[in-house]
Amino acid sequence: SGGFDFSFLPQPPQEKGDGKGVGLGPGPMGLMGPRGPPGASFQGPAGEPGEPGQTGPAGARGPAGPPGKAGEDGHPGKPGRPGERGVVGPQGARGFPGTPGLPGFKGIRGHNGLDGLKGQAGAPGVKTGARGLPGERGRVGAPGPAGARGSDGSVGPVGPAGPIGSAGPPGFPGAPGPKGELGPVGNPGPAGPAGPRGEQGLPGVSGPVGPPGKGAAGLPGVAGAPGLPGPRGIPGPVGAVGATGARGLVGEPGPAGSKGESGNKGEPGSAGPQGPPGPSGEEGKRGPSGESGSTGPTGPPGLRGGPGSRGLPGADGRAGVMGPAGSRGASGPAGVRGPSGDTGRPGEPGLMGRGLPGSPGNTGPAGKEGPVGLPGIDGRPGPVGPAGPRGEAGNIGFPGPKGPTGDPGKGEKGHAGLAGNRGAPGPDGNNGAQGPPGLQGVQGGKGEQGPAGPPGFQGLPGPSGTTGEAGKPGERGIHGEFGLPGPAGPRGERGPPGESGAAGPVGPIGSRGPSGPPGPDGNKGEPGVVGAPGTAGPGSGGLPGERGAAGIPGGKGEKGETGLRGEVGTTGRDGARGAPGAVGAPGPAGATGDRGEAGAAGPAGPAGPRGSPGERGEVGPAGPNGFAGPAGAAGQPGAKGERGTKGPKGENGIVGPTGPVGAAGPSGPNGAPGPAGGRGDGGPPGLTGFPGAAGRTGPPGPSGITGPPGPPGAAGKEGLRGPRGDQGPVGRTGETGAGGPPGFAGEKGPSGEPGTAGPPGTAGPQGLLGAPGILGLPGSRGERGLPGVAGAVGEPGPLGISGPPGARGPPGAVGPGVNGAPGEAGRSDGPPGRDGLPGHKGERGYAGNAGPVGAAGAPGPHGTVGPAGKHGNRGEPGPAGSVGPVGAVGPRGPSGPQGVRGDKGEAGDKGPRGLPGLKGHNGLQGLPGLAGQHGDQGSPGPVGPAGPRGPAGPSGPAGKDGRTGHPGAVGPAGVRGSQGSQGPSGPAGPPGPPGPPGASGGGYDFGYEGDFYRA
């Protein structure tokens, strides 16, 4: 027991046990001998270094010296070098949907695009035939190829602030955000409450004797010869039962178990959730032309529409298809060529005529984006398309945010192991003191991936993500069924004026009508002075006058010179609707006027009837992951998931300073051993004594039966951040989990900067003519547009060859001019008059006031089809016409051919930071991993802090009253818990509410052979 301290001698290496010996535990505890006197330390003169001798046998460990004084605080170390950049981790799991972000502000108006390219001249039209009956509404034809995008125009004036739009459908969940920077070290928190009683840990490995107190280090002396162990002391009296030791550290994992027997074949699992959409497949080759489909059944009669508002002036119609050939009549005698007649009146509107489709026009400038339309009814699922080729692996995503700390789980009671064979009794060991905590074990390997947990509850929709790159153009979807056309929407905003288009070819010369009787020569009047326009009086507009009786149509006067342009007068009130007048002879076609000012947008029309559900299109390519939104509100607790695999062992926290040890009390004299008394009541736990000498390690005892798990301990305080560990190896990409159901559609993010225009796409092949579609309901009439500015007079074309005389048309309607005073009645008994000489060309009069708009006349009876006239000479192209007003909205055409992918757009501005999310659910505790093999004994670690207080031991005899020790220092904060595992994806939420009705764009419709085109 006395003698020198041999703790500085090298210890023999500990042999690694195979873990197969089983005994009934260590032998009975030996009696503690009396404490020997402290060994005298001496320092010999420094000798010359000798040859390294062989390692002698290990001497007995001497008793522990008195504890040294607490060392002074050391100087803070130099800041470490910045760590190397870590390897990009695998793509994190999909984060919880964040809370919906606040609606963004309305963006400023974009630049007006440049005028579109000048269109090519159309092909010459076909000879006009008789107007056929209107055909049934055709299907939507394939759209023309997309035109090249114009460069950005100058910034337009800032328009008035529009009304706040209704909230759009919720956005897709954002992708996990990047890992935040390290925050500053927080102040140490207050001490937490005492945790519940912990489980009894495995006995720790005896640690080395603590370092001596702070003192000047002496010169190393010559290694002396190992001393002989002293004689064994006289056994002392039986000591009192000590308090239960502190909870030991968790032992190293045991060796891997042997492979178990094959289990029974399980029942077939239920069908997994729908997988995520596959990547966009490559554009397939053009398939062969399909067979002509049979005519579908006649659709149900449409609902009777209400009378619509007055429509906008329609665009110029295209040349109709030549009508059916009439029955051949008897050849008449050749007539004498008559003089050139006046231009005939326009023909009556044909009933259900079918025009040939014209050449595809150039794409106009892109209109403004309309509001979100009403969501359609879920379409019927279309046929499953062929599986596309496997896409390239995506980029590794950002690591997901760190999950919250999971609540401690309650493990189930394990099965009791088989009792091992009885081991040989070990030698009596000295009663060793509790050693310091052992070294950190080797990190366990990655466990196998556990089965997918049940789907969680639907999370809240995340905030709108930043605008991602434009996705690859999707494949063309299957044509949906034609729904009933909705009513025409409100008139869209006026687009920028396009360039003047090329003049179309001169149409065929119409049939000549009979020459009317020339009128009497009028007296040439002197042009009066142009009066200034009068201002509108304060009174209200007068009542509309009644329409006068139809006058006798006068002879066609010669074209007068262009008069001075009068100032625009105030708009008069609409006159009462007059009786339908007779159709007048058409005047010469005026030049197309310049485009008028855009009128104010009319009120939104009522929502149309819900269309029939379209067929479901093919699944588009998955977009890139957005950034992670803030955590959403806590959902309902999910079902208990299956137990996950055991995670890697966490790093040890920074060891806190050891508190001062209290002064030892005086030892009392040893009394004579008395007779063994009865077991006394349990006394209070004694103070922790000085650490005794470490005894020799006995043989390992048998494995005890695993006891029931104790109650979960309280959550520890968050400790200081540990030093950065070494960079670990790149983990293998885990298996792709089952795709969760699609989430809500996210809110519309801010529009990104416009990308550069891609090259113009090539025209797609001409599609097959479809079967005639269902006749749609008539749309509501749009509001009347503002009158356009009068156009310049065009150059007269060359005179065409006169055609044969046509049938005489009905008398024309009264012109807009003021009715002349009735002339004096002529004599009825006079001779018949002769044709007078042609009158002199009169000067052009001033523009008359605009009369009220007359109602459309009733369609007249069908005239007989006249013989076709000869083709006239091709006229000179007239002046460029201005763009007509936007027509009513036609139904949406099918998707066009896949265009060339555009360049990547510029990144949008960073959105505002989202609201902080609520704390998520805690993960479940994983199963303990298999015990690993014992590692080699590590080097002694530093003295750790005192372990937690163990449970109360059995009652011992009453101890003597000791002196009160000094109060201990505040212990360090605990190590932060490990990160919880990512929970499974939640199930698909309910569909979002329908959005507001969208504004309809412009366009005009024309049908052909049952196909419905939209311009």
Curated annotation (Swiss-Prot):
Residues 43-69, 140-169, 194-208, 235-250, 324-340, 497-514, 568-612, 619-639, 657-670, 687-697, 751-778, 786-799, 846-868, 877-897 have a biased composition (Low complexity). It holds the Pfam family Collagen. GO terms for cellular component: extracellular matrix; extracellular space. InterPro entries: Collagen, Collagen_superfamily. The modification 4-hydroxyproline is found at P10, P13, P38, P346, P349. Prolines at the third position of the tripeptide repeating unit (G-X-Y) are hydroxylated in some or all of the chains. Residues 20-30, 302-311, 441-450, 534-545, 674-686, 734-743 have a biased composition (Gly residues). The modification 5-hydroxylysine is found at K106. Residues 70-84, 640-649, 901-912 have a biased composition (Basic and acidic residues). Residues 987-997 have a biased composition (Pro residues). Belongs to the fibrillar collagen family. These protein fragments were extracted from an ancient scute bone collected at Camet Norte in Argentina. This is Collagen alpha-2(I) chain. It comes from Doedicurus sp.
